[in-house]
């Protein structure tokens, strides 16, 4: 099961904007790029996510798709805690084809806290 449509980055133009103007946060396995949307309305747009996995990670599409599913699952778990109004692209670094879901969840939590996207909880409480 994927992410809700409201929470997906779709067009290459959106990905390019995040890559060019977004802030970068990285861990051992993941790279998080964040572009905050400055919306003048009182209702900010929901946070949107995109996942980019290069063929350098694995030549096999099966492996890349499995990694995408694991990352989407981690995002779904964290979605209620995520502040609205950002566009986020998550990239995978190096050889992570052997990583488990729990590793992605833990690293994604750390990166989202570092980027101040998870709100309402202190670092000690959430980790």
From Swiss-Prot:
Its EC number is 3.1.26.5. GO terms for cellular component: ribonuclease P complex. RNaseP catalyzes the removal of the 5'-leader sequence from pre-tRNA to produce the mature 5'-terminus. It can also cleave other RNA substrates such as 4.5S RNA. The protein component plays an auxiliary but essential role in vivo by binding to the 5'-leader sequence and broadening the substrate specificity of the ribozyme. Consists of a catalytic RNA component (M1 or rnpB) and a protein subunit. The keyword RNA-binding applies. It catalyses: Endonucleolytic cleavage of RNA, removing 5'-extranucleotides from tRNA precursor. NCBIfam families: rnpA (TIGR00188). Disulfide bonds: none annotated. Belongs to the RnpA family. Keywords: Endonuclease, Hydrolase, Nuclease, RNA-binding, tRNA processing. One of its GO terms (biological process) is tRNA 5'-leader removal. The gene is rnpA. PANTHER family: RIBONUCLEASE P PROTEIN COMPONENT. One of its GO terms (molecular function) is 3'-tRNA processing endoribonuclease activity. This is Ribonuclease P protein component. It comes from the Bacteria.
